[in-house]
Design a protein with these regions (language model features):
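Extracytosolic ligand-binding ectodomains
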Residues: 1-409
Length: 409
């Protein structure tokens, strides 16, 4: 707090000293590292300013996601400083907190009013991003999300540093259809993310010749939802007989999805003992279940779960960045840190001596980053401002996430 006070009073040297102490004491905290680098940038003079919008309120999952995003942004800011910025000008990062979609719109309005802000990284959820985009469009302010994957987000100022649900849903549909022809979907109908990935999966699966039973979905969030009953119905009902269960919770209903996985695992034990034995119900999911929480609270019940993700620290391409980051933060990083680093790198690439919101927005369209400038995979945008590239499939084996390599497909 003293550091923040010194910074606000323009006493940057004092702020630098205080934030340096805070950084040394909290190696894992990206916020203090950003404040430290902001103070250095101000002291140096004429910093370039970008904003990052993350949820930093009471909800622990949201806070964790927010911190993961900030780690990626802090790492890019730090790297820019180590290269002495651009002609000696460093980067200042404004951190804004949006814990819900109402707040997201307000935050976007505030950021657009600050004319020094050249670009925005955010928001975390597709819900929040959707609420905020119209404000950025009015101000012609580029926004690049590293975590919002919904296909319903499309705007001339909106870019994505993460694969959209188009890529994830398609990958899951193709993988499922290779071995199973009937699928059931558990999702939250009120979430743009859940709806988006469900729609892509359904369209693609049906196009291949598969059938989604109990359409359009089983609502995980309904007050009457009974996982045991719904799983049994999906397997046994004459018009169902699903072979695959797709779990598409939003970030707020992941615990219900993990409970559902538990019921599927229980049901699979019964299916094996039937005469004749019935094949097990295969579980698949999107990236909302790609968390340590899934492994710890799911335990044996999530064994065999297949998840499509945007980035995985064990792949050949990601290893070098993942190891460097783990040393920096004192522990493994998540995909959110990787894609947020990439989002910040894309914005940094557009900076020039006389950068304006307009030059940044136009620059993003032509950004091309090599694998050595990102978290491991090249970054280019399609004409729709989507990130080029494929989702990665993982399986939970022995309580760990393991890559399903293309040769295993």
């Amino acid at each position: 707090d003293q550091g923040i006070r010194a910074f606000q009073q323009g006493n940057y040297q004092k702020a630098i000293t205080l934030f340096q102490q805070a950084v040394d004491a909290n190696k894992n905290d990206p916020e203090v590292l950003i404040y430290y680098n902001n103070a250095l940038a101000r002291k140096q003079g004429s910093p370039f300013t970008l904003a990052v919008v993350v949820p930093l309120d009471k909800n622990q999952d949201d806070r964790n996601n927010g911190k993961e995003i900030l780690r990626g942004v802090a790492q890019a800011q730090e790297q820019f400083k180590q290269k002495n910025g651009l002609n000696g000008r460093l980067l200042e990062i404004v951190i804004a907190n949006d814990s819900n979609k109402e707040k997201a719109k307000e935050v976007a309005q505030e950021l657009t009013k600050d004319s020094s802000i050249l670009g925005v990284i955010g928001h975390n959820s597709s819900d929040a991003t959707r609420a905020a985009i119209p404000e950025y469009e009015k101000a012609k302010l580029a926004v690049i999300s590293s975590t919002s994957t919904s296909i319903f987000l499309n705007n001339p100022v909106f870019f994505r540093a993460v694969n959209s649900d188009e890529s994830t849903g398609k990958t899951l549909a193709e993988y499922t259809y290779k071995t199973l022809k009937k699928a059931v979907i558990f999702a939250n109908p009120n979430s743009p993310y859940s709806n988006s990935i469900r729609e892509v999966f359904t369209n693609q699966f049906e196009k291949l010749g598969g059938e989604v039973v109990r359409k359009p979905l089983i609502d995980l969030t309904a007050s009457t939802f009974d996982p045991e009953k719904e799983v049994a119905k999906s397997v046994y009902a004459n018009n169902a007989k699903a072979g695959a269960a797709l779990l598409f919770p939003d970030t707020r209903s992941t615990n219900i999805a993990i409970n559902t996985a538990k019921e599927i695992t229980e049901r699979n034990k019964t299916l094996k003992t039937e005469n004749p034995p019935r094949p097990e119900l295969k579980m698949l999911a999107g990236d909302t279940l790609y968390t340590n929480e899934t492994l710890t609270s799911g335990g044996n019940n999530v064994e065999g779960l297949i998840i499509a993700v945007p980035w995985f620290r064990e792949t050949l391409q990601a290893k070098s960045f993942a190891q460097k980051s783990a040393r920096k933060w004192g522990g493994d990083i998540s995909w959110r840190t990787a894609t947020s680093f990439d989002a910040a790198q894309a914005l940094i690439k557009t900076l020039s001596n006389n950068a304006t919101r307009d030059t940044v927005l136009r620059g993003l369209e032509n950004v091309s980053l090599t694998a050595s400038e990102t978290s491991g995979y090249p970054l280019r945008f399609t004409s729709e401002r989507e990130r080029e590239g494929q989702s990665i499939l993982l399986e939970i084996k022995g309580g760990k996430f393991v890559e399903i390599t293309p040769s295993q497909l």
